[in-house]
Amino acid sequence: MADAEDIQPLVCDNGTGMVKAGFAGDDARAVFPSIVGRPRHTGVMVGMGQKDAYVGDEAQSKRGILTLKYPIEHGIVSNWDDMEKIWHHTFYNELRVAPEEHPVLLTEAPLNPKANREKMTQIMFETFNVPAMYVAIQAVLSLYASGRTTGIVLDSGDGVSHTVPIYEGYALPHAILRLDLAGRDLTESLMKILTERGYMFTTSAEREIVRDIKEKLAYVALDYEQELETAKSSSSIEKNYELPDGQVITIGAERFRCPEVLFQPSMIGMEAAGIHETTYNSIMKCDVDIRKDLYGNIVLSGGTTMFPGIADRMSKEITALAPSSMKIKVVAPPERKYSVWIGGSILASLSTFQQMWISKAEYDERGPSIVHRKCF
C-alpha cells in the first residue's frame, strides 16, 4: 500500500432512494438511484447480452421490463445481496476504483439497529477488503456541511426523517427523534391521490413516474386550508405533466396535498407527530440552556426538504409552538439534497479525522462489533 498521504478516501452516502458517492475533497461524481432491477420476462433473443440484474440508472432506463426493488427501506438495509450489488456497482462501474486501496466512509440513519452497521462493516472488510472504514451519522454530516457546530438538523430523505440536535459538535442521543415518514411515503400517497382521480399508477416502474411528478410539481402550502380554498375557486395552481406515452395529466390541489403529509401524518393514517412537531419535541428534550441556540439554527437536509415553501412553513409552525420571544431561524442550504455527502467529504478530508478510521487490523482483532466502539 502506498503512502497514506496520496490515498483519497471514498465517501458513499447510501440513501434509501439515491446513492451519492465520490472521492473526499471532490464533488459527488456518482449519483444514482438505489435500485436493483430484475427482468420480469425470460429473454428469447440470444446474444442480446441480457443480465440477470441491473443497478441504478440502467435499471431505471429499462424499468418497463424490470421489477424494481430498493434494498434499503426506511434507512435500514433489508436485502444485503442487492446492497452488495449496489456497492459493487458504485466502486467498480461508477467510480472505477479498487476498494481495497481506499478507506471508505459510509453513512447511516441515527437509531438504526446495531446489526445493520455491523453487517455493513463486515461486508466492507470481508467482501471488498477495504483498508479502513467508518460509519457516520447522516444528520451530523449535514451540519458539518452547513459550517455549524451547533444546531438541530431535520434530515428527511426517501426512507426516513430524523431530527438530531447537536451542540458544539456533540450529537445529543437522548434527544434524537426518528420518523419513518419520508419521500417514498409521499410518492405512495400521491399514487393513491392520482388513482382516485382515475389515473392508474400501480407497478414499480410507474411509481418512478409519480416520483418525478412529485419532484417537479409538488410544493408546501404556507396555509393548507387557505390553499385548498384557492384551489377550489381558481385554476391558478394547476400544472400539466406529460407522461412517457404522451398523455398529458393536469394536477392541481395534489401539488400541495402530497407534501402536507409531512406536517399531518394522520392524512395517510400514521399516528405520528409532523416534522415541525418532531423538531420541537426534539428541542424540548434538550437542556433548557441550549434550546435558544437550537431554535436559531434549524438546518434542513435531504431530498424531501427540497419542496418549495417548506422552510417558510416550518418557520411558521415552529414559531407557533415555541415561546413567543424566541428567535427562530430555519436554514435551507441550496445544496441540501447532497449535504450529507458534502459533510462526509469534509470529514474524511480532515487531518484530525485520520485516527478515527477503523483499520483492517482492528477489525481482524475485534470483529464487526468494533464499529460501535469507534463510530458514534
From Swiss-Prot:
Q: Which GO terms describe its molecular function?
A: ATP binding; hydrolase activity
User: What Pfam families is this protein classified in?
Assistant: Actin
Instruction: Report one GO cellular component.
Output: cytoskeleton
InterPro entries xrefs: Actin, Actin/actin-like_CS, Actin_CS, ATPase_NBD
Catalytic reaction(s) noted: ATP + H2O = ADP + phosphate + H(+)
Q: Where can this protein be found? A: Cytoplasm, Cytoskeleton
The record's section on SMART domains has: ACTIN
What keywords appear on the UniProt entry? ATP-binding, Cytoplasm, Cytoskeleton, Hydrolase, Nucleotide-binding
> Taking the first listed entry, what is the main subcellular location of this protein, grouped into a coarse class?
cytoplasm
Q: What does this protein do?
A: Actins are highly conserved proteins that are involved in various types of cell motility and are ubiquitously expressed in all eukaryotic cells.
Q: What is this protein called?
A: Actin-1
